[in-house]
Amino acid sequence: GVVGLNTATEIKKLIRPNLDNSLNEAIKGFRPPGSMLNVCVYVENVGDYKEQVIFYESLKEFGNKSGVNISFASEAGEDLSKENIISFVNKINPSVFLTFENNQLSTVDYFQGKHSLSNIGKKLAEIIGQKLGKEPNGKSNMLLKNTKSVSIIINGNFYQIKLDSIFEVISGVYSDIY
């Protein structure tokens, strides 16, 4: 027959009916039954040290309340290269890699390349964006493209974000998948 633009998608649907995410996306989310969801967080080094420490403690607290195991790829008061962040995240391989970037944008970024995108990342970005009043945005930057985990970047003044809703969304999306 004729091979068209949607042939690969049609074949995936035949092989894995009722599943919207690719096999690669599904593999990223594998975890043993009953285990906690692991989220690795990177926080851009901005603001004074005390403000950063309070933000880190809040992340840990809200993550634990939502049943999420939090690890950090950053430390208060320290700058890291993107290569070191990517290497660390790929080594611990969390379910989700969450980045907070302080800038003027009001978006939640997920991976979207020329020929592929992260379906789970897009779903997370859409729901988190809705809760925080930010636009979901498909991008292909270094942190989104080179980490093996589902990656999300939350842009804006992150010290003013309601953190509890972020981890509730992540838990909810992953419980829907499993």
Task: Go through the PLM ranges and name each one.
Residues 1-178:
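Catalytic-site microenvironment of enzymes
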